[in-house]
Amino acid sequence: IYNNLVSLRQKVKNAWSQIEIQLQRRFDLIPNLVETVKGYMGHESNILTKVAELRTAWANAKTVAEKSNLDTQLSDTLKTIMAVSEAYPDLKANQNFISLQQELANTENKISYSRQFYNDIVTTYNTKIQVFPSNIVAGLFNFTQETLFEVDNPEARKNVKVDFNN
């Protein structure tokens, strides 16, 4: 039983690591996107500032809840970038913008999958440490509940629009 709990806990850590990798990739893509967009809409520099602040906050965040909250804020910022760029037809034809948009869409899909996998393994782990007889072993060896990766803001539950082919 103990070995099974250790294995599940390691799977939770690995699944969280996969989320962090994809979220970091998105953080890395967005400044490139903002730089591409900035040439078309110079007066929107506050967006770049917001991204920089979120990246700093991400580096300092320690808990799943903190990182989940920052993910929500980043999604909102991304929606703003995409909404503002809608007003610039030349931008939508820019090959660099199109490429970044596709990379971002792929990353969003990977984030979604990673969240789902993480939450599935956390649910399995949390259930295992609560049911008999593994709950006895879990209590003896300090196996504690893990936090699900949840989106608090109902608006943020909507998919980020990254396709301008309409």
Feature map (PLM): residue ranges:
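A helix-centric hydrophobic-segment signal that preferentially recognizes long
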Residues: 1-166
